[in-house]
């Protein structure tokens, strides 16, 4: 009975197309205005996305870090996970563990690529890009980090959408940059038909080479005029080494322009110390000059060329001794003493 009922009801698509009839309007023909209105709505209606194909590219990226990272690194990791729907997260790794353990973590998480952030001295951040478990891998020093929350740019993109990857033409000039280009393509490009991705392309990742560093930017593509508006985040990758294996092995390339953060801080300290020593030397020279006796220069006759001689006044010689000046205070004291003596005499005479 159930099968016969289903046959009578028909397919769900046919049922959806049939208009519902009310008891009140039973037997009345549909109005032409309503039919025209429905036709216009169907024209304006945006069709849904095309049926997804088969998900063939099974790239999965493990993004995690070591212990001791600061808040900016943590926010950068969250931004990358949000921009890369094919990524996976894991707990922080202990500093005591060796880097080869990450290959086992990738195998357990079913990931074939890894982005690992390694923090040192609570101020230096290193990024490892690795193809697990056979390699190759690259180590970078991360500089100039600016997260999404920090930048507050006007650009925006759909969460889970697929990005375009734009590379500097300089990536094709040198072999180690060509290797890094292929590496970045495999890591940052979202696989087609990924379950967590959206069938839209509305932003672009740009990788630019400047000052022997790789600069990362993320821009929104505006549909109206195809202009670019920056979204974020921003960071700069300074290449250190490229290894043949995953997190180790023979060195394929070493950057000759790389300067470690410790060396950079040492140079800055030496420059400030040199400035301080220079100031102290200037002060010592000034003190020594003050203590030296002044050298008396001989009279230069050419200095008196434009000097006009002053009128000579006659010198008067005083032959008579000048009268002594009257000291008024001493005179008052004498008068006071006389007056006091007279009073004493008078008081004695009256007593007799």
Swiss-Prot record:
The modification Phosphoserine is found at residue 260. Transmembrane segments: none annotated. One of its GO terms (biological process) is rRNA processing. It is found in: Nucleus, Nucleolus. There is a cross-link at residues 159, 313, 321 (Glycyl lysine isopeptide (Lys-Gly) (interchain with G-Cter in SUMO2)). GO terms for molecular function: RNA binding; rRNA binding. GO terms for cellular component: nucleolus. Residues 34-46 have a biased composition (Basic and acidic residues). Residues 1-47, 281-301 are annotated as: Disordered. The modification N6-acetyllysine is found at residue 275. Keywords: Acetylation, Isopeptide bond, Nucleus, Phosphoprotein, Ribosome biogenesis, Ubl conjugation. Residues 59-248 form the Brix domain. InterPro entries: Brix, BRX1. Belongs to the BRX1 family. Required for biogenesis of the 60S ribosomal subunit. This is Ribosome biogenesis protein BRX1 homolog. It comes from Rattus norvegicus. The lineage of its organism: Eukaryota, Metazoa, Chordata, Craniata, Vertebrata. The gene is Brix1.
